[in-house]
Curated annotation (Swiss-Prot):
Name of protein: Putative UPF0496 protein 2
Family per similarity comment: Belongs to the UPF0496 family.
Major localization class: membrane
Location in the cell: Membrane
Transmembrane segments: 224-244, 252-272
Chain segments carrying region Disordered: 385-408
Keywords: Membrane, Transmembrane, Transmembrane helix
Keyword Coiled coil appears in the UniProt entry: no
Transmembrane helix among keywords: yes
Organism, as annotated: Oryza sativa subsp. japonica
Topology term for the membrane: Multi-pass membrane protein
């Protein structure tokens, strides 16, 4: 301690720079993320032809086949590398939504059988909407992954056409480039309408779930206060009856029987009877369990909504970067084959390709992380729902077993 206090600030060793990228990778790439990422890249070993067949998009059918034939006719040595890069997009065939819609439907049927009057409450309606929205969010993320792959192929085709245009093949390259630029941007809002729709539904759903959870909390508190007040009033009434019986017993022997009957109806027994009757109608525990389920659903909808916010901003950035490359290609088309202009366009496209590749890779990672978040929140809500369910009766179990045997 003395040596440290006597040392001058100049003698203090310099602190090593903070490795932000390393810390980010350690925090971001958890085990669950790496598992899903390995599933996502399961199809990287497939050939480029089979990949195109499995991930064909509507915009590829409007002249895209002719352009691909034109591009691959060049026979350049970088075709294998480009096809490997274009395969970086993968479809999550191994991803399983948990809990599955079939299990949710089966649980809803079991819950309806336990009721005397099968009707849907507001809590159940909100929970069903939550599971529907998260399922649609999963489908939207899958569609976004397809759009990421289409964006990679779109920009790769753009680069190759510009290289052919720079190489002197003006007529064919210019016609193919004109057709390609007229295609829609794969990351445009019109192409990702499903993603933007489900993104817009998350925030209102989280607000409604939180409002319903607060309402159940107020109902549970009011029920506890009402039960306590009713119990106190019942105890007071029983005490008044006992006092009246004692007064009557002092004036007549008949009062002894009345007093005995009053003592038999003790406040504790009356309170227990009233508690059983109230519990048959509604229980504060029911409100507490339903409130816990709604709280988990509200948290899940909020988290999924924030993840979709991040993904939406990243999609906007990647869309602008890809659109910048398309604008540069339009400038090259209007340049009448001028050599300096084509060289400047090639340099600009090379820089755009590096930025776009990094943005699409980061976007793909965040989409996979969003899928993990969707599964985790759905499992938490299903766990809270299972905690509040009573054990199934033997008749229900027998009926369910018969249904499974019939379906199998």
């Amino acid at each position: 301690m003395i040596e440290r206090s006597n040392s001058t600030p100049s003698a203090t060793p310099a602190r090593p720079p903070l490795a932000v990228d390393e810390e980010y990778n350690q925090a971001f790439r958890s085990k669950s993320f790496l598992d899903l990422w390995s599933h996502a890249h399961h199809h990287l070993t497939h050939t480029f032809s089979s990949f195109k067949l499995s991930t064909s998009t509507p915009c590829a059918g409007r002249g895209g086949a002719r352009e691909d034939d034109f591009l691959h006719a060049g026979g350049d040595g970088g075709a294998a590398d480009d096809s490997e890069q274009s395969c970086s997009y993968t479809v999550l065939d191994d991803f399983v939504l948990e809990p599955s819609p079939e299990s949710l439907a089966r649980g809803a049927r079991l819950q309806q059988r336990r009721r005397r009057r099968p009707r849907r409450h507001r809590v159940e309606t909100l929970l069903i909407e939550y599971f529907d929205v998260t399922e649609e969010a999963c489908e939207a993320c899958s569609a976004l992954l397809a759009a990421i792959g289409a964006a990679r192929r779109h920009h790769l085709t753009l680069r190759r056409l510009l290289l052919r245009l720079d190489g002197g093949d003006d007529d064919d390259a210019k016609d193919a480039l004109a057709r390609h630029v007229r295609l829609d941007n794969p990351l445009s809002p019109g192409s990702l309408s499903e993603f933007h729709d489900v993104h817009a539904r998350c925030s209102p759903l989280a607000s409604r779930l939180a409002a319903a959870q607060r309402r159940l909390r107020r109902l549970a508190r009011a029920l506890r206060i009402a039960r306590g007040t009713a119990a106190a009033a019942l105890v007071g009434a029983c005490a008044a009856a006992i006092v009246a019986a004692v007064v009557l017993a002092a004036h007549a022997l008949v009062g002894i029987g009345v007093a005995a009957a009053a003592f038999g109806a003790t406040p504790a027994g009356a309170a227990r009877w009233w508690g059983r009757r109230a519990a048959e109608k509604v229980s504060s525990r029911h409100y507490a369990r339903a409130g816990a389920t709604l709280d988990a659903a509200a948290r899940g909808a909020y988290i999924v909504g924030r993840d979709l916010d991040t993904v939406s901003r990243m999609v906007r950035r990647a869309h602008d970067e890809l659109e910048h490359g398309r604008d540069v290609a339009r400038i090259a088309m209007r340049g009448h084959g001028e050599r300096p202009l084509l060289q400047e366009v090639a340099r600009e496209e090379e820089e755009c390709e590096e930025d776009l590749r990094a943005q699409l890779a980061e976007l793909e990672e965040h989409v996979c992380l969003c899928l993990i978040t969707i599964n985790r929140t759905r499992r938490l809500v299903a766990h809270e729902m299972a905690r509040g369910l009573p054990p199934p009766s033997p008749a229900t179990v027998t009926t369910t077993s018969e249904e499974r045997l019939t379906s199998s």
